[in-house]
Swiss-Prot record:
Main location: endoplasmic reticulum
Protein's name in the database: GPI ethanolamine phosphate transferase 1
Location(s) in or outside the cell: Endoplasmic reticulum membrane
Keyword Membrane found: yes
Species, as recorded: Neurospora crassa (strain ATCC 24698 / 74-OR23-1A / CBS 708.71 / DSM 1257 / FGSC 987)
């Protein structure tokens, strides 16, 4: 495809996949925020006030519901009695048993701090992409409880408080924060919570002296927000089952008790409502973000003015309990679960302010100490806020649609929202409060359904467009492969006037509909790619026909047809099994076990000739199969880190000892080559850097485990070792050794120190086994090609091309054949394994931050995330280098196999696109998002790996190249001698003539 050479194909691949990754956010996770709504609150007579004059919100960041309410031994026992399990939050527990109402607040994905706080305080669920905005100052630019309050005072983290302070009415919210340097994962995080409690005490001490402040604190409709980050930081550092985390719960409970008593002593009016909850939970491996139940279940304890007393069921199990709360010893107290956004509605009601404009929370009536009439009024106001959002959204949708399809329950056959609200008002006026509450609850569900209907209004059109786009990419990629790497550009594209008019008309029609609908700019991108891809495929239809003859021309008998169909079904089955492997990691183990027998399919003669190589492949596959059987959620294991690092050092030392054997393709018969002493010295330095990384990592890990912090010297040396090791390949340019095995070792040792520093358990062993598997794969594929080519006569499809004026490729590159599909499939499986063998496929959050603390102990999500990405990229770097060498050994173009994989990989992407969920269990939602994003990014990685591969193998020589060069030199000398002899004869003949 002369018009679209290789580098343009790669650029198109990257742009297309990045654009289409965001399609799930335009389809499934559109921001629900709207403006222009009227606000509603419960109207009361002048002589009646709100349930509470003030509200105190405690958010224990990262606190799991079970850990808060279970019984545990004393974290730091001083006597045998301390070993007896007891509640670690006795004050909060007393509120559950005596004064308030409790339950579990269920969060949504992503289970991160910003989305969690937005749901709690604004009552809405931001779209999933908003999680990244929580890592930088990005004001919450929509309505919230704080914005509705008369005034809000807040204390806590600089990552959370400024968002609400700067997003509210100027001067409405005061935020008191500690510095970012306090968020040190290597220090005692309880100091963060103690800082908050101490500053609240100082604040009220100042109020006793400051008359202006005291008057402000005596107003109604005020809110106090205490953000307690210590639990989250401790959970990340030590895990939520650790004594440090449990001790932090004790400190939080004591702090809440002291603050509650402070309010009681200061106000002495009993008009304060207290809410204690969390923004998200924490997984057993110290992370959050996905939809695992440990991350989505948080405690909710409410007590004080306007709050219902506990409902007790002595001697029996109270309603609301299940297996999850069986060990809390609270079975006799009714448990009232809520969705996280419901908390915002509850707090708004208690303090007597309007419900936030975009709130979708349902007011939990079971938490209210109100009579039935008050509950009926509150329910109606709650549903009016939802219906107001529906009205505004519907008006905007009508304005951009040629033919609007109304929501059926509110359509021609259903009652309008206004009519149904009027009916509920009549029920309240008639004193039929129970019926009014039931009707409000039913209308609430219909209203939320209407909001969802409008949210998903464009789904069918967009999903069809994206699907056609992905199918177009697959067809375009495979067409490009056939044109470039099978036909070598011999067939020119054939465009017709009719075809051009057709595709242009389709694009114009799509864009016209998008303009009328006032669609976002991203929609135009989604519409462009399908038309572009399918037009390219149509223009190269003759290439496809010629490619079919080249690739399938030899399939002309019943047996060959059956073999082709069977192999095709097998390959499709493997790809489908990889989709299941995203959920069940064990499937990758099965694939490796099956793949270990691949050399046996070539017969005994092949095994006899390549016995050692086949055995290496078999053992490497079996070893690789074990990693996906190990738990993805792993704790730090310094001994395993050390063992992995030592084995990396052993590999480097063995190479230095047996260099001649390795460079002779593992043969003892070859003559020893001249030693490149500079190159060997550099290998020794790389081995030394790996040893240094082991020492530093072990020291840093033990220091952090002992809670002694990260020594400054260790941090500096860790960075020096990491950077120096990554720069070492530049030194080899002084006197390069271009043998492919030497190049592979250099890359292996380049990444080894980084992998040691950033590993927490068995990942170092994976790095070793994975590297061994890749090397044996490169050698085995070459051996198979030589073996099969020596047995089978060459056909037109297998001959190496000669240089012709028609070919767009240089002579060394042979055309692809059907047999290369297996090589591409192996490459694809190895890509999946590179990511999944050490991580939980369903949860990106399973990649622990423990290793990053050895370099960056202070909370810095972008830098820490970059370190994790660097670690994840190392196996991909190994694959790219080995595949580049394999391309050379097989004689195919550098981009050929990359492009094949880029085409077939989106079969997985398209599958995961259709199974993305935005409702259901939070685990399902988070998993489907992760699956789609990972599958999409893998294709982007492949497109990026080709230039990486080219850089890694620049100038590298495989065995055949060296032999050809030597043969070429001999041939040149022979030709020179022949020419000299001929010239001598000619000149001799001429001289004789003259003399005569």
């Amino acid at each position: 495809m002369a018009a679209f050479p290789r580098f343009r194909f790669l650029a198109i691949a990257v742009i297309f996949h990045f654009a289409y990754i965001f399609s799930i956010f335009d389809i499934y996770f559109v921001s629900p925020i709207e403006t222009g709504m009227r606000l509603f609150n419960v109207q009361r007579p002048p002589n009646r006030s709100a349930p509470a004059d003030r509200l105190v919100l405690f958010v224990g960041d990262g606190l799991r519901a079970d850990k808060a309410l279970q019984s545990h031994p004393e974290p730091y026992p001083k006597s045998d009695a301390d070993l007896t399990p007891r509640p670690l939050a006795p004050y909060l527990r007393s509120k559950i048993l005596e004064q308030g109402t409790f339950g579990v607040s269920h969060t949504r994905v992503p289970t991160e701090s910003r989305p969690g706080h937005v749901a709690l305080i604004a009552g809405l669920y931001e779209d999933v992409s908003a999680v990244t905005t929580g890592w930088k100052l990005n004001p919450v630019n929509f309505d919230s409880l704080f914005n509705r309050s008369r005034h809000t005072w807040s204390w806590g983290s600089p990552d959370i408080l400024p968002m609400f302070e700067q997003g509210a009415v100027p001067g409405r919210v005061d935020a008191y924060t500690y510095g970012h340097e306090f968020e040190d994962f290597s220090s005692d995080a309880t100091q963060l919570d103690l800082w908050v409690f101490d500053h609240v005490k100082d604040f009220f001490a100042e109020a006793r002296r400051n008359k202006t402040l005291a008057e402000a604190l005596r107003q109604d409709k005020i809110v106090f927000f205490l953000h307690l980050l210590g639990l989250d930081t401790t959970g990340h550092s030590y895990r939520p089952y650790s004594k440090e985390y449990l001790n932090n719960i004790k400190i939080v409970d004591q702090g809440v008790k002291e603050v509650a008593e402070l309010f009681r002593d200061f106000y002495r009016d009993g008009r304060t409502a207290f809410v204690f909850t969390a923004d998200h939970g924490m997984s057993d491996w110290g992370s959050h973000g996905d939809g695992h139940p440990d991350n989505t279940r948080t405690p909710l304890i409410v007590w004080g003015s306007g709050v219902a007393k506990p409902q007790l069921y002595p001697g029996e199990v109270a309603p609301g309990h299940d297996e999850y709360s069986a060990d809390w010893n609270l079975d006799h107290v009714r448990r009232h679960d809520v969705a996280q956004a419901d908390v915002a509605a509850l707090m708004s009601y208690l303090v007597g302010v309007e419900f936030p404009a975009n709130s979708v929370g349902e007011l939990p009536l079971s938490y209210l100490a109100a009579d039935i009439k008050e509950k009926a009024e509150a329910s109606l106001v709650n549903v009016q806020g939802i219906l107001e959002q529906y009205r505004v959204k519907e008006e905007k949708k009508k304005a951009t649609e040629l033919k609007y399809r109304p929501y059926q329950p509110f359509g021609e056959n259903g009652l309008s929202p206004e009519r149904r609200v009027a009916e509920i008002r009549q029920l309240i006026d008639a004193g039929r409060y129970e019926e009014a509450i039931e009707e409000s609850a039913a209308l609430m569900k219909v209203g939320l359904g209407g909001l969802r209907y409008l949210q998903t209004y464009d789904w069918l059109f967009l999903r069809a467009l994206i699907t056609i786009g992905y199918l177009g990419w697959i067809a375009y990629a495979l067409t490009t492969v056939v044109d470039l790497h099978v036909l070598h550009g011999r067939v020119r594209p054939s465009r017709t006037l009719g075809g051009g008019l057709f595709f242009t008309s389709v694009l114009v029609a799509l864009y016209a509909s998008l303009v009328i609908s006032k669609s976002p700019l991203t929609y135009y991108v989604y519409a462009f790619f399908p038309v572009f891809f399918w037009e390219e495929v149509y223009a190269h239809r003759e290439s496809l026909a010629a490619g079919r003859k080249e690739l399938l021309g030899h399939i002309n008998s019943g047996g060959s047809v059956a073999s082709f169909v069977l192999n095709s079904a097998l390959y499709v089955g493997v790809i489908e099994s990889l989709a299941l492997g995203y959920i069940h990691r064990e499937i990758l183990s099965v694939l490796f076990v099956l793949g270990s027998f691949w050399p046996f399919t070539h017969g005994l003669s092949f095994l006899k000739k390549h016995g050692a190589l086949s055995a290496t492949w078999f053992l490497a596959c079996i070893a690789m199969s074990t990693f996906t059987l190990l738990p993805a959620m792993k704790a730090e294991n310094v001994n395993l880190i050390t063992i992995g690092g030592v084995l990396m050092v052993v590999i480097g030392l063995l190479y230095l000892i047996f260099e001649d054997f390795v460079l002779a393709d593992f043969s003892w018969n070859a003559k020893p080559t001249s030693r490149n002493h500079l190159s060997r010295s550099l290998v020794g330095i790389q081995v030394g850097l790996t040893v240094l990384s082991i020492i530093i990592t072990r020291s840093s890990a033990l220091s952090l485990q002992a809670k002694q912090g990260l020594p400054r010297g260790n941090q500096i040396m860790g960075w020096v070792t990491l950077v120096a090791s990554l720069l070492m390949p530049l030194a080899y340019r002084l006197r390069p050794n271009n043998h492919y095995m030497h190049r592979i070792l250099v890359i292996f040792l380049t990444c080894a120190p980084t992998f040691v520093i950033l590993t927490i358990s068995y990942e170092g062993l994976f790095y070793l086994v994975f590297s061994a598997l890749l090397v044996s794969w490169v050698r085995l594929e070459h051996a198979v090609q030589k073996f099969t080519s020596s047995k089978a006569p060459q056909t037109a499809a297998t001959k190496k091309p000669t240089t012709t004026t028609e070919s767009h490729l240089p002579a060394p590159f042979r055309p692809l054949t059907l047999h290369d599909a297996r090589v591409a499939l192996f490459f694809f499986i190895l890509l999946q394994s590179a990511f999944f063998s050490t991580g939980n496929v369903a949860s990106v959050s399973s990649f622990s931050l423990d290793s990053v603390y050895r370099l960056i102990p202070i909370f810095d999500p972008f830098s820490q995330g970059a370190m994790l990405i660097l670690k994840l990229m190392i196996p991909f770097a190994l694959i790219s280098a080995n595949l580049g060498i394999l391309n050379k050994r097989l004689g195919v173009a550098p981009s050929a196999l990359f492009m094949v994989v880029m085409g077939i990989s989106d079969i997985l992407t398209l599958y995961f696109f259709w199974v993305v969920k935005d409702e259901g269990s939070w685990l399902e939602i988070g998993s489907t998002i992760s699956h789609f994003v990972i599958a999409s990014l893998l294709c982007v990685f492949v497109s990026a790996l080709e230039p990486v591969s080219a850089a890694f193998i620049a100038g590298v020589e495989v065995g055949e190249e060296s032999e050809l060069k030597e043969e070429g030199k001999v041939a040149e000398k022979v030709v020179e001698k022949v020419n000299e002899a001929v010239e001598g004869l000619v000149s001799g003949g001429d001289g004789g003539g003259d003399e005569s």
